């Protein structure tokens, strides 16, 4: 795909008004574009920065057509919009990202099958339609393994870790609700991710490899550059190069990886949009993941590479972290704090993030962990 550059003053439509949509909008407006956002939540974070806001459900075809008619280009902040509706929208309006990636990645089974067919290194998996398949997973994959719903689920939702036979009943209940996928549980040494942007002229921009730590299946912190062997970044790029031959991408997306105790790299999953682990790039790189996303979908030239200006640590701020830390923000000028503007503070809800640039990652990490003690 090779589209002409979208002129400044043109309008970018965003489906989804959460924090990702908000940060996309801010990058777009900085480049001189207007932004119109569609979201069912009348007080979503993006509502406060959008030039125009459409308060409607994601499956409201009249509202989607209005968004399309008012926009010169359309993007989305998340992958849970109906692929069929996105396909219908793409047939009438300019959606450089298309619908194919969403169609593949909404279903964990087709995601795994596509990755397998691409030659990517992934953990063994099995489709689960009933309890008999669960028994087969015990035989073919062996304990421990993870059962995940095929559709939906994020931040650890829709998953059961099956360590032994005592967890089979919990997994059976998940399968009764919807079809699932079982995948081998890996003994991990690290989790990393690679954020990538692809332009409409097939340019590829890689961000630095990101080291991630999760707590209760929610991203806790990201450290850049990742503290791994030097060859791991190139290995990750090689895996991404396999993936982009199999899946159509325009804009920013992120591939999450596991590194096991034998130092083997495995593709875990793909997010076809800007990702939580890339938020550090707002301060730590000359272009953020949102900047390159907007450049890509508007037909602009992408940088050949994104340079890390300084090592960085990004910490997510959940509702409980704001309860603990909000009085500390004014005392730490080195903290770049982003509060998303969600109207309801919940214990485990992502309410914001903070980024610290540092020449000593280990020392800064320890200082931050002390601040987050008791969370």
Curated annotation (Swiss-Prot):
Keywords associated with the record: ATP-binding, Ligase, Nucleotide-binding, Purine biosynthesis
GO BP terms in the entry: 'de novo' IMP biosynthetic process
GO molecular function: 5-(carboxyamino)imidazole ribonucleotide synthase activity; ATP binding; metal ion binding; phosphoribosylaminoimidazole carboxylase activity
EC main group: ligase
Main function: Catalyzes the ATP-dependent conversion of 5-aminoimidazole ribonucleotide (AIR) and HCO(3)(-) to N5-carboxyaminoimidazole ribonucleotide (N5-CAIR).
Quaternary structure (record): Homodimer.
Lineage: Bacteria, Bacillati, Bacillota, Bacilli, Bacillales
Descriptive protein name: N5-carboxyaminoimidazole ribonucleotide synthase
Record-listed ATP binding positions: 108, 148, 153-159, 183-186, 191, 214, 268-269
Species whose genome carries this gene: Staphylococcus saprophyticus subsp. saprophyticus (strain ATCC 15305 / DSM 20229 / NCIMB 8711 / NCTC 7292 / S-41)
Family according to the record: Belongs to the PurK/PurT family.
